Amino acid sequence: MKPLIKICGLKTPEAIKVAIDNGAHYIGFIFFSKSPRNLSIEEAKQLRPLIKKPVKLVAVTVDADDEMLSKIIANVKPDIIQLHGHETPERVKHLSGTFGLPIIKAFSIREQSDFNEVAAYRGLVDMFLFDAKAPEGSQLPGGNGISFDWSLLKTLDEDCQTVLSGGLNAQNVGEAITIASPDILDISSGVERAPGVKDIKLIEGFFDSVKKAVEN
């Protein structure tokens, strides 16, 4: 089955257009001040009209409080909220009840035991996102351009959509699809020429690689 594709950390109309024209199913806006891909709410609001259904907008947040989430939702109107911090199951349940939007919960993976916390979120979220654990000293929970052992996902027994993130690019995405069989591929730094700067050719190349991998 061909995985869906999420392009994350887009900041310009040109990059958004190329991603959508090539078949992106999800566009991710990042609301985290420490990230080179961060957008202000006003910037995101200006870009929002470029994303039309059936493409869905994902608001990526890191331990955001209710006030910030309320502002994002009121102004940017995302279709989905991604929680990429240390949000507890109780926090996720609160956010789901408060805002009523589908939720993606990100988990940082390096080894098999890192999957242990996933079970506590069963039934609370709509998608599980698995990213490589950030290197020591990094201020970014994601978008670091590193991957984890994708074969670990084969042991996951969860009735929930899986999103594979971390270190994906045009060169390795075929292998990632073969090994992990994710429902959704999530790429950010793998289509950048510099941190936070998306490259049109790299975006196009990634989609071409996914197409070839699925056809073979």
Language model regions located:
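Conserved N-terminal beta1-alpha1 strand-loop-helix module at the mouth
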Residues: 1-184, 189-216
